[in-house]
Amino acid sequence: MALAPEWRFARRLIAEAGVSVVFGHSSHHAKAIEWHGAGLILYGCGDFLNDYEGITGYEKYRDDLALLYAITFDASSGRLDKLELVPFQICRFQLIHPPEEDVIWLEHTLDRESRRFGTRVRLFSNGRRLSAEPIANIK
């Protein structure tokens, strides 16, 4: 897979500069996630709250769905431990819990986009949170 310049840059920040998390923004919708070495690259986090309701032409990206990125660090080592994603839906300038089918859509879309970076996105059994972890760590 040929790496885009911004992907190489994000990986270098982790490998050479010791950055723990690269937080991508301005995509207006969630994009792929990559665990790279000891670091985490969030290629696009979308908008947590916006005023785009009613703007047409971008429905396939589901910019009405938002994610809270909950990153846990190990207290003794300071290393990244896990990433959990809490889905929300933006409705009338408020965040609400999305319907189950929208959470499943997020799971499938993020899993598909993140697999090329060696990361798996899965829905927790409670149906309210997603996990993202390196494929190599999944048993």
What is the predicted function of each stretch?
Residues 2-67:
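Conserved beta-sheet core of the metallophosphoesterase superfamily
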Residues 58-139:
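A short C-terminal boundary segment appended to hydrolase-like catalytic domains
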